[in-house]
Each structure stands twice: as structure tokens, then as C-alpha cells.
């Protein structure tokens, strides 16, 4: 979160385009924070993308012949079918670039990212800066009404800076006690 993942993906895609390569960029429908279809970084850099519901729709939108580069942003939001699809593309000689969060707001492995990371030839883990202490931030802090979220809150809740901020290990807080149910005290 705020480490420049989308910005780096955009930079790499633009380099491939400058090199004359055929490129396709995909993102999940779920990510509509800044634009319905473009991949957009927090600082406004953007590149055209195709927004898809799942890995099956991504596969259906791959042209024949295949592009030389396929890029996927926010991969943590995709279904498990994305993993074998990207492996298949790589096996066919397509350069695959993926951006996504490795951990959710609870600091737990996020969706399909652990498997994608394990199977990648190259992994570059970017960090932000913790706004609390200035240390490298490797975690995503979810804030609800300015307070740290509870562990039992839903994992997927797409937002921008008003809902999330980067945190270091020391400053990352997740409330582990379950929320009291209404009427539980009474």
C-alpha cells in the first residue's frame, strides 16, 4: 500500500511499449478506486487496462497471437484460476508481470499472492514509509473511523488513502478481540 506497486507496473509496461512489444494489461473489476478500467497509481500515473471479473474472463480476452507481455494489477483480488493461467502464459513465452499486496490488513497472506510469489522467477517487494514512525512500511493498516480494524472484519474492502495507510511491523495494529454483538451485555 502506497509503496509504488502500480506505479512500477505502469513503468515496466511503458518500457515494453517503447520497445515495440505487444502488451495487454488487466485488472479486477473490484478495483475501481480511481478509474473503472485504467490502472492508476496513487499519484495519478495511469495506463489503459482491461477490467475483468475473473481469470476466465481474462483468458477469454487474450488475443491470438498472444501478446508478448501480459500485466496484471491487484492480483490478490483474482480467483485461484489466475495462477495456472499465468504459468501457462509464461510457459508459452509471454512475459508476465504481476502487481499486488502479499498480505491483507491483518498481516495474513492475501489470496493467491503466496502461490504467485512462490512460482515467480523474479520478485521485487516494495515498501512504503510508515507515517507513524518513518520506518519502512511492509503492512497495510485498515482504519475504520480513524481506528484500527478488527481481525474479524471482512478481508476485501477496496478503498484509497482515507481507509488504509502503510505501517511498519511495530506500528501495525489489528484488534484481535471480536466485536461485541448488539445486546450481548444485556
Annotate the PLM regions.
Residues 64-69, 75:
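Short acidic/histidine-rich motifs immediately flanking catalytic phosphotransfer sites
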Residues 120:
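Short basic (Lys/Arg) and small-residue
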Amino acid at each position: 500500500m502506497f509503496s509504488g506497486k502500480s506505479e512500477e507496473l505502469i513503468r515496466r509496461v511503458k518500457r515494453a511499449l517503447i520497445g515495440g512489444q505487444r502488451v495487454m494489461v488487466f485488472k479486477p473489476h473490484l478495483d475501481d478506486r480511481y478509474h473503472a478500467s485504467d490502472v492508476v497509481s496513487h499519484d495519478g500515473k495511469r495506463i489503459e487496462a482491461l477490467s475483468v471479473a475473473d481469470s476466465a474472463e481474462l483468458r477469454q480476452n487474450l488475443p491470438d497471437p498472444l501478446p508478448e507481455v501480459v500485466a496484471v494489477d491487484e492480483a490478490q483480488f483474482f480467483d485461484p484460476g489466475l495462477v495456472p493461467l499465468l504459468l501457462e502464459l509464461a510457459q508459452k513465452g509471454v512475459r508476465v508481470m504481476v502487481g499486488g499486496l502479499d498480505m491483507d490488513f491483518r498481516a495474513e497472506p492475501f489470496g493467491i499472492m503466496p502461490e504467485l510469489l512462490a512460482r515467480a522467477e523474479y520478485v521485487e517487494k516494495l515498501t512504503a514509509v510508515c507515517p507513524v514512525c518513518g520506518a519502512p512500511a511492509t503492512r497495510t493498516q485498515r482504519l475504520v473511523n480513524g481506528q484500527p480494524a478488527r481481525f474479524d472484519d471482512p478481508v476485501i474492502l477496496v478503498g484509497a488513502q482515507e481507509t488504509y495507510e502503510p505501517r511498519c511491523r511495530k506500528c501495525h495494529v489489528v484488534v484481535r478481540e471480536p466485536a461485541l454483538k448488539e445486546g450481548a451485555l444485556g
